[in-house]
Amino acid sequence: KASTWDKTQFWEIEKDYDNSKETWHGFETKYPDIEDVNPTDYSTLYNAINFVVNSDDETFKREVGEYFDLPVLMDYHIFMEVIKPVDNCGKNMYWAVYDKSKSPKLTLAVWDLDATVGQDWHCGVPLHPEYVWPNTEMGVKLGLKLYNRLSTLNIDNYNEKLEARFKELEKTYLNENQLKERYQKYYNTLKNSGAAKREEQKWSRDSDIGNNELNFKDELSYIADWLQKRFIYLHSSDSPILTDIRNITQNSKEPISSTYNILGQKVSNNYQGLKIRNGKKFVFTKQ
């Protein structure tokens, strides 16, 4: 499990793992449990990250499908663009191997989706900062180097396939109206069971939600409005999926100029505190 941002966005890696340890940089062994199987084996994960970080373009084009389950990666890419999980582009993901005896290919699983559909995980001020707005960039291709290289090099027409897959999923699982109906169904269950009222009474104005009032009906309206605006954005000229610009022009030897805070959110260059640039951490404090 990618529990923190340390090395989990694949911009750099060090072969310094210890198979007797439960953690390695931002990664945490979950299955098999380290208490049941010790030593564990970080080599498969290390080899995959090292491949993303250090392979030349031709090797990456030729072999990336041997290291990663690309159809699953593509679906997760689209999933992130639709619901905008600002805490999940590298962090809060499970990496797993199907059967190491047959293939080292990694797949992924989703984890911890509290900071999605216009929500922010720490309930700060403002409650809905710009980076969770529906009409702003998620930054998938700039955040996780694996997606950056897939898109930049347009591996096996990755960009065209991403667009086609989005249009396909938009008819079913990621259809705007179906998503709204799903949230409505969950709300109805909470309301009819009395759970919504109990939760509102228990947690309204609590510090865990930033001293805000908890109102499920208002939250449902906010999510429905957010989804409507998000799909408008995804079909606009600024869309990170539907675009005629297929090749991101970038010298692979040059670092990404975008700067992120520890939450993976884009920040300005003069941001004070812990910043991540090109996968490396920098601490800036006021003089």
Which residue ranges define each predicted feature?
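Long, well-ordered, tryptophan-enriched scaffold segments
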Residues: Y17-L45
